[in-house]
């Protein structure tokens, strides 16, 4: 990873100042959503419009990431490029979630994601996407689930299972349990 783009809305100026005061060896650019929150899909779309890259790794900041995820991430990246797919989501079995209130977003069969009434896998907040999956977007404000649902309908939504403990800062209750 040579370039990092951070999409911001809340506390954008503070985040930008913090990054500018660090001595990171990466090219880091902070992109602001401006007047309106763009939601998850719109935020990623905002980054894509401000970039020339074809493929993007996105990480949600409300997951506690650590070096234990590195091998999983490298394996997921290898699968993505080897199979020339246009998306892949890192998921974890719901029993590995620190927050036992999180029930599941998807099912995983091989590396294909699906949904039904008994979803057992939680989206971790990490995905690799190709800009082409945003070609049909005609609105700047939308949830990433809009894209996922279209891919699910075509049976083209891919997943990769992490076996790490999943810690999502769902709310203040979870934050307090971690302290």
Where are these predicted regions, by residue range?
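Conserved N-terminal catalytic core of the sugar/cofactor nucleotidyltransferase
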Residues: 1-60, 64, 71, 136-139, ...
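Structural beta-sheet core signal
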Residues: 6, 58, 87-90, 159
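Conserved beta-strand termini and adjacent loop/short-helix elements that scaffold enzyme active sites
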Residues: 9, 31-34, 90, 116, ...
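Short, polar loop motifs at secondary-structure junctions
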Residues: 11-12, 92-94
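Proline-centered loop/turn at the N-terminus of a beta-strand
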Residues: 29, 55, 86, 156-158
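Catalytic-core segments of class I nucleotidyltransferases/pyrophosphorylases
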Residues: 57, 64, 69-81, 94-98, ...
């Amino acid at each position: 990873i040579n370039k990092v783009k951070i999409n911001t809305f809340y506390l954008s100026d503070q985040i930008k100042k913090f990054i500018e005061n660090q001595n990171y060896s990466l090219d880091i650019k902070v992109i602001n959503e401006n007047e309106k929150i763009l939601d998850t899909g719109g935020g990623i779309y905002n980054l894509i419009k401000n970039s020339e890259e074809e493929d993007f790794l996105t990480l949600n900041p409300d997951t506690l990431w650590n070096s234990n995820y590195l091998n999983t991430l490298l394996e997921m990246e290898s699968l993505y490029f080897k199979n020339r797919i246009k998306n892949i989501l890192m998921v974890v079995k719901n029993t590995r979630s620190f927050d036992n209130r999180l029930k599941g977003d998807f099912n995983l069969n091989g590396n294909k994601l699906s949904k039904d009434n008994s979803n057992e896998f939680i989206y971790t907040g990490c995905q690799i996407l190709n800009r082409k999956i945003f070609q049909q977007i005609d609105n700047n404000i939308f949830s990433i689930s809009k894209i996922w649902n279209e891919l699910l309908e075509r049976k083209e939504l891919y997943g990769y299972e992490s076996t790490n403990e999943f810690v999502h800062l769902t709310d203040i209750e979870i934050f307090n349990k971690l302290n």
